[in-house]
Amino acid sequence: MAKTKILNKNNKKEEIIDQEENEVDVKTTCKELSPPTDLEIENLEKLENSGASRLHIVLSFIKKNGIGIGTDLTHFEFASSFLLPHSTHEYYSDNMAREFDILLKSNIDNEIERLLGVFKYILSIKPIIEDSTRSPLRSVNGETKSSNFHVTIIDEQDKSEKIIKDNYYMVETLDQEKAFVGSCIYNKREGVKVHFNTETKTIFNGTNIKLPIIGNIIIRFEKFNEEYTITNPTLYGRYLRGFVEYCGETTITSKNSKYYIKKTNLAKPLIGGNVNMVEAKLLYGDDPNPLFKINGSWSNEMEIINCKTKETKLLYKRPFNYFTKIIPDILPTDSSIVWKDIIVPISKGEKINISKERSKILEYQKKLNWKISQFHLNTDNNIWEPIIYKD
């Protein structure tokens, strides 16, 4: 078991902590961390500019701020070296929309194939995160991202292509303090909708940063009056080992069908093994014996095994058929407007202090006092939905 020295949050003395122990439960009340001073941020900026390694910067950050296990970093003001020049809305919109063709092709009568389509879509929307020490800019109240996007459907038999243009997504920050976001990707004509109402925390967990995703993904196929509920795994930033991974057990259950999927996102072993590995079972009702087993890597290939016939075949393989065209609908509250003082200079190759610019933007947003404008709470199903579904 790998070990590392970190600070205990109570007495600030160094302790030896096991790699996979001392997990913090999502429901645990976490220690709130006081914001760092401008001087502390400036010192970290200097450390970054000195050419120090990323790991050295991270460990210095932990030590200087007295961060211990269970510290809530959700609203902590990070130095530039820990920030990406785009909003969290990039994850909710682009990642959830890019494989929407999988769901459109799964809008079929076969219950098992439809469920497998949902499974493939859920795996495919996970972003491959290259840097375990950087995070996007937290979105602000009322911030939006909206677009029409086109996807290409490829017929598996004759390989003919069909472009479907009437797909849309809308993302809006509903509660900045809780990092609560409403997101919907849909095709009104096809009656296919994805709702992603989630709250995200960032918790220091010793040898990793833990990001529990609180809330479910809801996928609807109105043609069949079918609704799927998908629970979310926990995201771990393994900063000492240099990668990010999803871990934990999740389920895909149906409102009407007895078919369901149990999925386990496996943690990479300390020695050997691979990251992003998944094991899953497709089951029916109370029968504990699976109909299908699914194994592989969500970032590479997944195979499916028919437990009765023992037939094994490829379920999917990355890369996929990304959306062919995006037509942004730039609202006054769009992410590109909110963060333009950060996004524009960086796109031009100019070096700026992201953390300081972010603080200025947040102060300005408080004065604007934006309200929720694009979503409303549907009290019939307790889901935040777009006020208007575009045709």
Curated annotation (Swiss-Prot):
Tell me which SUPFAM superfamilies the record gives: Oxysterol-binding protein-like
Q: Which GO terms describe its cellular component?
A: cytosol; membrane
GO MF entries: sterol binding
One Pfam family cited in the UniProt record for this chain: Oxysterol_BP
The record's listing under InterPro entries reads:
OSBP_sf, Oxysterol-bd
Organism superkingdom? Eukaryota
**Membership in a protein family:** Belongs to the OSBP family.
Q: What is this protein called?
A: Oxysterol-binding protein 2
**Which species does the entry assign this protein to?**
Dictyostelium discoideum
